[in-house]
Amino acid sequence: MIPNSIGLKKRMREGQQILGASLSADTDSDRIRAVVDSGPYDFISVDSQHSALSEERLVSFCGLCNELGVFVQFRIKHTRNAYLIGNYLDLGPCGVEVPQTELDETVVESLNSFYFSPEGGRSFGGRARRGAADHLDPVDYGAWWNTYGILWMQIESVEAVTRAHILAKPGVDCLSFGPTDLMFSLKVHPNHHLKTVDDCVAYVARSLEGTGISVCHRIGSSENRQKFADMGVTVLLESASIQT
């Protein structure tokens, strides 16, 4: 769908290992830089699903990251907010993660809201958009964004795991795992052939081989990098541990 990807999107499509760190949107510029350099990390993930986060705070945080040249992946508040993805992106994130994805309709709506025409139907606007100052012409901006922005769909149930190959539609860059909610789902399916979160991660990684769509897992600390890399996970999201 997006043959000429650039930057981080291109690296993900090529199956390169990508490292990210989770940070609060209240983090100041000095700590952002210290965390990114400590990895070194390729992107920062910020969350609104389980965290209080105003639009103004998101604009401010993304502005700081833009000044530092740091890629921001943003998890939206709820699955049903997929129709607002374009609005969220107008506030400055470089990518979006949609939590608790299970239905084809969610993916279709996310793709339409994420990409500009002809790949999608995102509306043009927003002064805080990443890259807005460098691409003033709307058509030029849309073409650039469609090769740059990164869309994750988060899978957090056994049902979503077994349908991963269907949810991984063209234009989706990554399927990410929500291990805690997935653990609850596994307990509801005690006789399923997938018994653990690790089983699910390995299953999805195998099912996406050769598609150019990455698998992301929240791995806690850097000590777990090799374990999940060996499973086929190429996007590793860690908790920022450096103290400043």
PLM segments and residue spans:
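Alpha-helix-loop-beta-strand connector modules within alpha/beta enzyme cores
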Residues: 55-81, 86, 114-124, 141-147, ...
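C-terminal alpha-helical cap/extension of soluble enzyme domains
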Residues: 125-133, 152-162, 192, 198-244
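Glycine/Thr-rich beta-alpha phosphate-binding loop at enzyme active sites
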Residues: 177-198
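Hydrophobic faces of well-ordered beta-strands that scaffold small-molecule active sites
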Residues: 18-23, 44-46, 72-76, 96-98, ...
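N-terminal amphipathic alpha-helix/helix-capping segment at the start of soluble metabolic enzymes
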Residues: 1-22, 133-148, 203, 210
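Catalytic cores of alpha/beta
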Residues: 32-37, 74, 79-94, 98, ...
